[in-house]
A protein has these predicted regions:
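A short loop-to-beta-strand structural motif that recurs across blades of beta-propeller domains
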Residues: 27-29
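Short, solvent-exposed loop/turn segments at conserved positions within beta-propeller repeat blades
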Residues: 21-24
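Single conserved hydrophobic/aromatic residue that forms the stacking wall/gate
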Residues: 1-11
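Generic structural signal for well-ordered beta-strand positions
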Residues: 37-39, 165-166
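C-terminal beta-strand edge segments of enzyme domains
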Residues: 53, 138-221
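Short, acidic, Ser/Thr-enriched surface-loop or helix-capping motifs
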Residues: 31-33, 158-159
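Active-site beta-loop-alpha substructure in enzyme catalytic cores
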Residues: 62-136
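Flexible, solvent-exposed short loops/turns enriched in glycine
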Residues: 46-66, 121
Length: 222
């Protein structure tokens, strides 16, 4: 009964966001046979127009559909949850597309990655498989096993070489058990990636500026 009561309390507070004065959060909770362990990961990269609405006050005056958008707040944790002596780097749903989601977790000693996701709104489209492909990329980039667990999309284990194991069909109940290896190494990507981002962004800006200058010089008067 105590576990059921705790589950109900956490569900109301963290999932429904109904606790007075508490923000809405998309949170992954660590739950064991002893109940909620008080450890969670709050999604840091929340989805615009779904989990939150940019320029909400303005858009609400324009469209009645604005009320359907969520009002979630992003988290600021390191993305690591301790699980049975391991350290899981958690990226919720499409949070895995952001470079820093896995990199930051690895910097905080994550030795495998978990991607819990819903996918219900994707239907039978290829978005589920796009997310799975991005998870493959992260597995190779960071040299970590990735476990994708979906409520309705494709679940799978992905080894550090990008191989997909035990992939499940869409909208079918399955379970799978597999032993995975834990890694502590850091790849070159974990160190170089932030600098490469800055370099290519700077180059892109310079190319745009150069194109504008060149266009103005070559502009033919009408």
């Amino acid at each position: 009964l105590s576990s059921s009561s705790a589950a109900s309390d956490v569900y109301k507070r963290q999932v429904l966001g109904r606790e007075s004065h508490s923000p809405q959060l998309n949170a992954i909770l660590l739950w064991t046979g002893k109940g909620y362990q008080g450890i969670r990961h709050v999604k840091r990269h929340i989805q615009p127009f779904g989990e939150y609405l940019p320029l909400r006050r303005l858009v609400e005056k324009i469209s009645p559909y604005a009320m359907w958008a969520g009002n979630f707040q992003p988290g600021n944790d390191d993305g690591v949850i301790p699980v049975d002596g391991t350290r899981a780097g958690v990226a919720t749903c499409f949070e895995i597309i952001f470079d820093d989601s896995g990199r930051q977790a690895v910097h905080h000693a994550a030795n495998w990655l978990a991607v819990p996701t819903n996918n219900a709104t994707f239907g039978f489209s290829n978005e589920t498989y796009q997310q799975l492909a991005i998870s493959q990329f992260r597995a190779r980039e960071l040299h970590r096993w990735v476990v994708v667990a979906s409520t309705s999309g494709a679940s799978a284990f992905i080894s550090p070489d990008g191989t997909i194991w035990d992939e499940t069909p869409l909208y079918e109940q399955h379970y799978a058990v597999r032993s995975i290896s834990l890694y502590g190494i850091r790849t070159a990507a974990t160190y170089l990636q932030p600098w490469l981002d800055r370099i290519f962004c700077t180059l892109g800006i310079l190319v745009c500026i150069g194109s504008i200058i060149s266009w103005k010089k070559c502009k033919i008067p009408l």
